[in-house]
Amino acid sequence: MNPEQFQQALADHGITLSAEQMQQFADYYQLLVETNEHVNLTRITEKNEVYLKHFYDSITGAFAEPRLESEDLTLCDIGAGAGFPSLPLKIAFPQLKVTIVDSLNKRIAFLEDLVAKLGLTGVTLIHDRAETFSAKTSPYREKFDIVTARAVARLSVLSELCLPAAKVGGEFIAYKASAAPEELQQGGTAIKQLGGKVQKTVTLTLPGTDEERNIIVIDKIKATPKKYPRRPGLPSKKPIQ
């Protein structure tokens, strides 16, 4: 997917990118590839692949939750790595107020450079572990309209890291590959215990490929019990069963 195809694929979904926004994506790609030579940010570096599997893939969250396109929502991205999905969403929908949490200082440093280079406002970067970011005494607990994660961790683990940050009435949007139905089945208990309820799963295929993606939207219907999230490392070591 080259930049023009990227722009057209989004236009097909009613999302229009200006020349300025397209330039922001071009600058994002450039800095990502340059920084990746000395900081491990991504194994995907070929231009067309980045536009498809990072930029386009990130924005598909808006296909599942159209409010991202126009409402002044607060969005928290847990473990964003090189900024996915939150920064492509922010470029496409500048009214979003974005908070990014990542546990690696090198990634936060890259994101600081990137946000400055792209001239983005309304972006807060926090160096922290997810478990302490939304712990029971944290000012960020249950504060966000939308919490996103695009990570390889199982849904039962991601839910414990993400649902505590979503406000009651908010949503957790999980970006998953093709194993989503299986993960939903295994993660059902965790989602319920953490105050969530699965609203829907939107399944799509990345254009020009047979790669399946699943966007899982989980409503936060009640407050998360104070004992969650558990201490760092425990959610992945002993997922809620």
Curated annotation (Swiss-Prot):
Residues binding S-adenosyl-L-methionine: 79, 84, 130-131, 150
GO MF annotation terms: rRNA (guanine-N7-)-methyltransferase activity
Family designation: Belongs to the methyltransferase superfamily. RNA methyltransferase RsmG family.
Keyword S-adenosyl-L-methionine attached: yes
Broad enzyme group: transferase
Subcellular location: Cytoplasm
Any one GO CC term of the record: cytosol
SUPFAM superfamilies per the UniProt record, alphabetical: S-adenosyl-L-methionine-dependent methyltransferases
Name under which the protein is recorded: Ribosomal RNA small subunit methyltransferase G
First-listed, main subcellular location of the protein, grouped into a coarse class: cytoplasm
Keywords from the named record: Cytoplasm, Methyltransferase, rRNA processing, S-adenosyl-L-methionine, Transferase
PANTHER family: S-ADENOSYL-L-METHIONINE-DEPENDENT METHYLTRANSFERASES SUPERFAMILY PROTEIN
Listed EC numbers: 2.1.1.-
Known function: Specifically methylates the N7 position of a guanine in 16S rRNA.
Tagged with keyword Hydrolase: no
InterPro entries membership: rRNA_ssu_MeTfrase_G, SAM-dependent_MTases_sf
Native source species: Limosilactobacillus reuteri (strain DSM 20016) (Lactobacillus reuteri)
